[in-house]
Design a protein with these regions (language model features):
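An alpha-helical, amphipathic repeat domain used for nucleic-acid recognition
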Residues: 1-103
């Protein structure tokens, strides 16, 4: 049923793909899942802290590919990458700030 499918799809996208809420919600809508069911499952599986942690982990793996670029360009590219993966602009900005402040 839709409930089980939504749950397993969410688990897969969160744990293996490290997708953000926006991307997951979009994919589930394309599969024909109702908005209220999507929101219910997303709220149960993903908090803002978890979302930030996943985005940070994803960014750490990606940031090495930007070596040699100037910092501003690298930050912009990383931010755009995170937003394409479904993270909000606020989380993408926070992750980029934290990653590039570490350097």
């Amino acid at each position: 049923d839709d409930n089980d499918f939504t749950n397993s799809w969410l688990q897969n996208r969160i744990q293996t793909k490290l997708y953000g809420k926006h991307r997951i919600k979009h994919e589930l809508k394309l599969k024909g899942i109702a908005d209220d069911m999507i929101d219910e499952h997303l709220d149960a599986h993903s908090s803002d802290d978890n979302e930030y942690a996943r985005a940070f982990k994803l960014a750490q793996g990606k940031v090495g590919s930007f070596e040699g670029s100037d910092a501003q360009r690298s930050q912009r590219r990383l931010s755009q990458f995170l937003m394409r993966r479904g993270y909000s602009s606020a989380i993408a900005y926070r992750v980029c700030k934290d990653i590039f402040d570490e350097s």
